[in-house]
Every structure is written in C-alpha cells, then in structure tokens.
C-alpha cells in the first residue's frame, strides 16, 4: 500500500487582489522577503536559501529562476513543475547562523502567483520561533488556484493556524509570535502534474496587535452524559509568555446546535482578563445539561459561542455534546448483528457514505472534518506520525480524533489504521521484526504467530485497533520492489505463515478483538500483486509494481488465490485490493484493475470464499481505474470495495458517492451491505464501549520480552547458503575483521517501512546493529566499513553487505535499483576474502547476484532484513543457535533468469528454493538406502496424520542430500530439491523424500 505523510493545511481561503493594491497611509512600507532576482541562492540548511523536498525521489518539484516579460516585479520569477504522488514542495530557510527575522510590525504576507485555474490548494507554511528553520514551530494556511494569470494574494497572519499533524520539535508555545521568523514553505498539490510561477514575496500592512495574545480552549468537544455538566477552560496566552499588555474580554453564550432549549440551561456572560494578567491564566465556563423525558436519544450539540476582544479568538467554537443514550445499538449485551441493524436503520445516506470514507490523519488537521463529514476512518500513511513520535503522542493524537467523532449524531467511533508490517514500524522505539521474507525463511508458523502477537500488542497500546497486514502476496519476480513483503514464492509457504493472522486478531471468531493486545488484520493485496510482469507497470518510473498479472484461471487459483482462502478461513477482518491489473487468459476482458474487478471481489472473495469482513481500498487505489472520478467511485463500490482510502480527497469521495446513489448508479442495498460490514468490525473491536486508547500495554513497547521474540525470529531467518571448511559458526576467541556497508546500520538492516514509508539508512530507531551484537561475542574485533584498515593478523573476516532501504515500486529493478552489490561492497568482499577466510552476510530484501564471487567466499548467509535485533544474527554466527533457515525464494544465477520459481520447466538457480545448510552439531549420515527407509517412514507418518514426525523425516532427508551436494548445484539437482520443499509444505511427506532422493542421485 502506498502511504506517505502530506501537509494539508486548514482550508482558509485568502483574498485575490487586483494588480494595483492600495496601502493605508499609516501602513509601513512593504518589506521584501523574496524578489527572485538572484538575491537568494538555491541552498540547503544550514545555509540560507531555497530548497526542494518530497516523499520520494520523484516528488520534489523542479525549480528555476526564469526571465519573464510579464514578471509582476523585476525581470525574473521562480518557476517550476511538479508531479507528486506523495508530498512535495519547497522551502526558503533563513541562514541558521544569522539572527531570525522580526515580522511582528506587519499584518501579513503576500505573494504573486500565476494561476492555472485548476481548483487545487497550495499550502503556505510559516516557521516561527525555535533555534532555526528546521527546529521551529510551524503555522499553516492555504489558498486555492482558481484563477488564471498573475494575482497578488494577501494572507493576514491571523489566517495561519498551528500545524497539528507535524511539528519538527513538538511545538514550542503554540503562539504565532512573529518576532523570530525563520522562513516559509509552499506545499504543492498531489495527484496530477502541474506547473507554477511565483514572484514578489513580501510583508505588508500594519500589525494586528491582537496576535500578541490568543484565547484558547482546552478542547473543541466536550461530551457529557445527559444531565451532566461540561467544564470549558478558557485560557489567555501571549507570545513569549509575557503578561498581556491590554485587557482581553471573552463574551460567551450558548446558542444554536442540535439540542433543544429544554436540554440545557442557557448561559450568557463575559470573562475578563485585565492588563497585566499572566500568560496561561485560565477561567472556566460550566454548561449544565438537563435530563428530559426521552428515554432514548441520539447525541445533541450545544455550541458555546465565544466573542473575543483584544486577542485572537479560538479557531473553532467549542461544542458541548450530550451523549447518545438508550438506543439499542449502544447496548453491549445485544448480539452484534442486532446492534448493526439498529444503527444502520437510523443513519442517513450521508452518514453511511461517511462511514465508507477513510482520510489521512494529516489531511484533517485538528479533526473538525471528522465531525463535518461523518468520517468512519483515519489512517497514518508511512511516515505520518505525531510529534514527538512516542507511544504517548500516538495515543493522545488518536484520542483527539475519536473525541471529534463524539460530536456526530450517533457517535460512531473511528477505526484507525496503520501499516505495521514488521512490528509497529511507524513508532520510534518499537520492536521491529524481520520483514516477511525473513519470517518465511524461518519455516516456523508458531514463531510467525508470536511476531504477530507482539506487533498487535504494541500497535493497540498506542490507540490503533487496525493493522494493514499481513501481505499475502506470492512473489514471483525478485525485481519487484515489494518482494520482501512476501513470505515467499510458494503459495503453500505463504499459507503456512498465516498463523500471523491469529497473532494479530486472536481466535477466528473474533472474541479477543476487544482485548488491549489484539488488532484487526488485513489480508493484502488481493489478487495477484506478486505476479506482475516486468515492464508492465504504467505508474511513474515503476517497472513492475502495480503492473499486470497475466494468468489462467487455474494458475490464479493455485498460486495467488490460495492464501486468501486460508485467510478467510482464519477469520481475517479486512481485505485490501491490489493496485495491479489482472488479465485472465481467455476471459476476453484484458487487463482490469483489481479495484474494479467485481468478479473477483464480489464473486470470488465475498461469494465463493464467503468473506464476511470489509474490503478497504489501497491509497488512492480507485483513482487508477479508467474514467472520471465519479466513475471510479461507482465502479469500485459496485465491485465490492466497502471503504475507500481517499487520503486527501475524502470530501470529494463522500460527495461523489452520495450523488451516485441518488442517481441510481449505486444501490442503497450495496451501501447498506458495505456499512454493515464496517460497523460489524467496529462493534467486534469494542470501539463503541472503549473508543479511546487503552495504554496499559505501553510499557511493553520495545520491552525485553518483545525484543526477545524479534531476536529469535532474526536468528531463525538466517539462511546459510555456503559454509566451506566450517567457517561458521565463529569462535569467540577468534580475531575477527568486520567490513561492509550494512554491518553497523540499523536503518539498512530494518529496510523500508521503518519509521517512514521508504525507510532510511542510519540510526533511525533504537536497536542493535549486527556489528554491535558481534562485539558482545568477540574478544578481538576490528571494524572497517570499507576494508581500508590493515587485514593482517585476523583469523576470519565477516563482510556485511546488501541493499539500502526502499519500498514498493521505488525499489523496482530498473527504477534506480538492481540486484548487484554496490561497488564499495564488492570491493570490501574482494579485499577481505582475498586476505583471509571469510563469511559474507547479505542484508537485503531479495537475493543479490554473487555468482561471480562465490568461489572466493567461504561462507555465504542470506540475512534478509532482520530488523532491530542484530543479536539474533550474532546468535547464529557464534553458534548460540544453529542455522536453520531455508530459502523462501529461489536464488538466481543471473537477472536474465528472472522470473525463476519452484516448479518452472527450466530451473537452474544458484541455490534452489528450500536450500539452507545447518550448523547443528550432528548432521545425519546416509545414502540411497537411508533415503528409501525415510520415504517409507514418511508415508506412514502421512497416513497417520503425524505431521511433526513427517516433517522431521523430510528434514533429515534434506540434510543428507545437502551434505552430499556440498554446493554442487545443477539443474538436475535443483528442480527435484525445490519440488520436495513444496511437497513438504503441502503435507506430502513421502513424495517429498522421494524427490530428495532424486536430487541425491543427480549429484
């Protein structure tokens, strides 16, 4: 799923002024900020200048100073182009080494903008206070490009609001002081290419003195039981926390809302804060609600109107909410189906459409739209985190959003979702598990379930009840940038690892979903995302991700559908369609986007498989369906998508859906089905009874117990591909030389989807690097990343190489990535392995091509992406645990072989699927006679239903065969060896041993 954080400011429209702007006689002269005549360089912090930024390599806009005859001021303008899928824009930071600027004498900021009349919003952000432009407090607003040609846009400073979705230092004083300004930023529209031109940024007008003081309330929503009293705290605050220098009055009055006069005691009065009042002084207003004769009512609102003199008023009118009560759907003792039916019967079409809408948390700002749009769900895209990124901040943020839902008529709680795909990977300090490719290598379903349980506990402890995991893709081409999200290339292996669903959700019947350590799981991406053909993608510069999967119906069922059959049997609560297109041979339809395939979503998933959860679209997934937006909405919902992830277009989606229903193009029955499915999961999660975060599990986040599970998983995921001369395990007495780019890098060993969407190299979250773990076990260790330190005098070398982080199509081969080691890593391998016995660890999300160096390497380990617990890798390197991992995918000899998978008619890999040497102290001896006896015993175990014994017999046969092969892998050997692994996973133990015997004979 594509997830990125995006700044979305409050929708505050500004004045669009004519070319000539009058200035009042007492206004100060405008002060230029940028003239774009070359006086400000393009430069990155800490230097002063203009720089671009974005969610990935394609998102930053292009910028240039262009000479224009029509430039509003001077000869040049700042112009550029953009094509942003995540987020992107540009910033002018003032130099860190120079004093901040004082803008407090002015009314606002204005600029010339060349309109394209595209109706899109441009966000403008100011950087106030703090140490510098990257450690300041952010204030934001926006204007709409709904005009053509040059216009001067004036934005009073009073229009800027505190940015709630992100603050680089967690906020400072929540007051726009204007005395220490560090620059500004513009965020450009997302979703379609565009161009822009900007000129003459300057300060204008005389300062509004009310900006120096602000009136705040402690909340925007105050829920109370009928007959209860709401206490509204009103606070005055000033820039720099100085006492107010002029009196501030706050007149208050209860007026309007949905409550009737008999529901509360009318209130009217005034609060006074005299000159000299200390900043932070608080007064209280109490609103008393009344019990009435109605035994059952929906929620009702009582706005408390505040009129402020002498200071900036709160951005919103606080709302007292008299909670819904007495209605059947609120009765936790009733069966879920009855609660759903009762609530559904009361809802309007607009409210139902809201439940089918999911927005990005950054898009809703303070959350007012949650109430206004009756939103059913929010998500955090990759990297969309609160500031600071702590468990406590996550819980506070989500609770603040849930509070907004309390102001809706039926107080339907939000369901909040995140991509916790290898632990709660969004949260700094969480336990980061190996990615799925490594979990598949463990061949340990019980361990997979335990990793899911740890993930669920840490996710739920931050207030998140829904995880967009697991990925059940069957990866068939390692050029795919999402290969590491798969458990492997064999559907039988993927199915065996689906115990993770129980780790996340608990038992199939969902009875534990209300618990504080369980979350709703999502099987993704339905259907065939791992089978797309290289070169078939039409998404930006992607080469394979989101492309076309071309299969027969038989292949579709056997390879790609099988894991979903298992997931439905396990009770998975939600399913997410794939961005990819499915082209079924012979059906005459050609490639059709999965979000539009009613035959697959309605027909197969909900019909044939009997899936009773709800279907959630991927990030802007419906936008890829051909046609206009109304058509996208109609097609996807009619195809069976129940909730649409419309991160920033959530209003457009809800409006379009209502219109499609009213036009008769989407039936109300289809809407009721979708909303029933969504409400069912919300009731099962216990959100109506406990909408707010239960943080009792927060102490377990990143705890020793949780990290022990991740450490065990990291150890079990290590696959020993070669071990000439018994180089591994290492001895603690040996003098070890360690080199390579991935030896000492938490970010690289964790991979993409770690803290941010793409992940990043470096010390991004607490953990133990492989080098740090090795130091704990070695009496004498030398580390030299590039192997430049002297190599003499060492007993053995360990070179840790591989990939840097990426996610999704950004990591596609041909999109700036390949399957080759970097030049620096190749040089380190060559130098160390020429000087001493060496072991090479490949830390990567997929196989890397090492055939040309294999003869020089004594030991080779596929370490995958082990996560934060490097101790697990050291455990097997030093023999604390044996190597037991097996390849979850085929390791190719060359890129030309791709795609290459178990069962292919031509199969000649470097290492076959299922290959994995062991460092157990006793590897069994034997030959053809032993293998024949093992086949007989395996057949008996199979007939008796003795799975553990059958698997043990196949394991013994495999070890015998691998011992004899000693790395001599030919096509005649590899094919039956890989086939045996598939047979093992499908419970055909005797046939698996016979295939291994065939491989033995081919050596």
Features from the language model and the residues they span:
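Short boundary segments that mark the start of a structured unit
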Residues: 208-326
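Secretory targeting and sorting signals
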Residues: 1-24
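Glycoside hydrolase catalytic-domain context in secreted enzymes
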Residues: 325-924
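Beta-rich carbohydrate-recognition modules and glycan-binding surfaces
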Residues: 26-210
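Long, charged/polar, soluble alpha-helical segments
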Residues: 924-1003
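Short, acidic/polar linear motifs in exposed loop/turn regions
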Residues: 115-117, 161, 240-242, 293, ...
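Buried hydrophobic-core signal for structured, non-transmembrane domains
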Residues: 109-111, 184-186, 232-236, 285-287, ...
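Low-complexity, Pro/Thr/Ser/Gly/Ala-rich linker/spacer regions in secreted
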Residues: 23-31, 202-216, 239-242, 309-334, ...
